[in-house]
């Protein structure tokens, strides 16, 4: 995350590819913003939310933490977070409104969807804050993003297997979020390759496992959409 990095300390090798890193960040934000806008559009048409409940709460909580509690000094990055939080809240309200039809098989969930979503956000929010207090906001930002991505990718596949339904996901929705996340991987690769003193940990076994899990889960989901 640029906002937590002192670019004056970046090695010359990284400074030479910084333009490419910033391009990846731009397209990462663009991909996810397009995904959020499409989710709102589908919800307004009365279609179900394409994101499972826990990943939705987790995403909103993560964005809130790094918008309010640990805001990025990078104004462009902060603006992207504010836009993401705003759109995610619109998604949340749409999901709460459509809960009666989407969760008709669970009367308790259908009746108290709004309260359950708020409770889920609070739980995830405090978890992300606790992680930042434990390992520092710079590392917690990245690990929090990993948690959000895995919850979304694995949750989507589980939803597909359990309900035999994409839950409203379309090809455009999937491709925008997948490409946005792939741009984040490209950005992380440049950090690891050209700034190993600070970002060598991005090649740790757990990060590589998380990357492999994300790719397998999301590509599996994409193939299922085509079938």
UniProtKB/Swiss-Prot annotation:
Compartments, as annotated in UniProt? Membrane
The family database entries (InterPro entries) matched by this protein are listed as: PaxB-like (IPR039020)
Q: Please name the Pfam families in this protein's record.
A: Pyr4-TMTC
Q: Which GO terms describe its molecular function?
A: lyase activity
What does the record say about its membrane topology? Multi-pass membrane protein
Pathway field: Secondary metabolite biosynthesis
Signal peptide per UniProt: none
Sorted alphabetically, which keywords does the UniProt record give?
Lyase, Membrane, Transmembrane, Transmembrane helix
User: Which Gene Ontology terms of cellular component type are present?
Assistant: membrane
Q: What is its EC number?
A: 4.2.3.-
The membrane spanning regions, by residue number, are: 20-40, 51-71, 76-96, 113-133, 135-155, 173-195, 206-226
Q: Mostly located where?
A: membrane
Expression induction per the record is:
Expression is down-regulated when the stress-activated mitogen-activated protein kinase (sakA) is deleted.
- Report the function annotation for this chain: Terpene cyclase; part of the gene cluster that mediates the biosynthesis of lolitrems, indole-diterpene mycotoxins that are potent tremorgens in mammals, and are synthesized by clavicipitaceous fungal endophytes in association with their grass hosts. The geranylgeranyl diphosphate (GGPP) synthase ltmG is proposed to catalyze the first step in lolitrem biosynthesis. LtmG catalyzes a series of iterative condensations of isopentenyl diphosphate (IPP) with dimethylallyl diphosphate (DMAPP), geranyl diphosphate (GPP), and farnesyl diphosphate (FPP), to form GGPP.
Query: What family name appears in the similarity comment?
Result: Belongs to the paxB family.
UniProt protein name: Terpene cyclase ltmB
